[in-house]
């Protein structure tokens, strides 16, 4: 069987071949591809990724056949018609039995269906842009957003409001895609409900994700963690909820003044020139000063897979404070390692975290409850260890490589038989 994947990221293996830095967090999709190939010896896999180049590039020297397709979009033009022509060439060259589109967020997913039709085509849900757009500002009012406009925002016409509008445009393409295909793969009751609301007759297939390899190899230990430390996997735009942690920190610090927050990603507000600072950076910087907590935050830069594991293991608690998520890999990774988790009760997180059993939940806007949850884990090592043990059990089942690979092969066979 020949399977052609469309991916939003360039696989790390190909990045190394062409001299690019591997994408942060992109290793999970390559891990899934490798598990698929190793479990099914007669399967041939091709992967299409997209880049800002000028020509179609093909790499056939690996176990996976890679295609790099030029794609040029802007905030004003979110769909590149030329991509359809390139994808026709790719499909003619590879001749897939099944096309598996990973993600609905970008125009190239729709381009595949427009170019080659929806027969024997499956779309996997990652995030859902058409719904995420409603939460992009993370509860910050438009008035507050507009008051924090920066020189960069004005010159580049790239404020948080315009970013939200850009997401809405991509959401329109996403809806068109979902209405054009017959098979969807999802993994939460939230994504199931969202897809059902758009196209109720579509065939929904359930399948969990396989995570990056390193996260299966280590185990969090209370005795080895850094006490009163919080880890966040990202925070550079408002949907991810960094500002909620800033608001909670004075309450946490009242009981635990030595609390520190470690954030994967670059410092985007105090270590860059003013002319590169965006509105959210302005908002975050001011909020930190108002709460006198800027000294408690440590931005770690772009972290490799191994460094991410290291930070999860060091943390006393991991928090996912997002305004919306489907099934964030960061929560899955933390649970697989056993790092005690706190997460906002949004989107598909309800299917990943059972309150007081495999993590602690709070409503996104409930800052006192978030702060209290952190203090509970800091003060109660028995609770922390209970959560850790339970998380590892449920995550090991959810992210089991063999189970998930077998399930995806079942779906491929079912679709191919039509």
Tell where the protein language model's regions lie, with residue ranges.
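Conserved acidic donor-binding segment of nucleotide-sugar-dependent glycosyltransferases
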Residues: 355-356, 360-367, 376-381
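Conserved donor-binding/catalytic core segment of Leloir-type glycosyltransferases
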Residues: 4, 221-240, 246-251, 261-264
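Nucleotide-activated donor-binding/catalytic signature segment of Leloir-type glycosyltransferases, i.e.
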Residues: 275-302
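Short hydrophobic beta-strand element within catalytic cores of glycosyltransferases
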Residues: 340-343
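Membrane-proximal helix-turn-helix segments that form the acceptor-binding/catalytic region
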Residues: 145-183, 193, 197
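Aromatic "clamp/platform" in nucleotide-sugar-dependent glycosyltransferases that forms part
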Residues: 323
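N-terminal subdomain of nucleotide-sugar transferases
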Residues: 1-54, 60-67
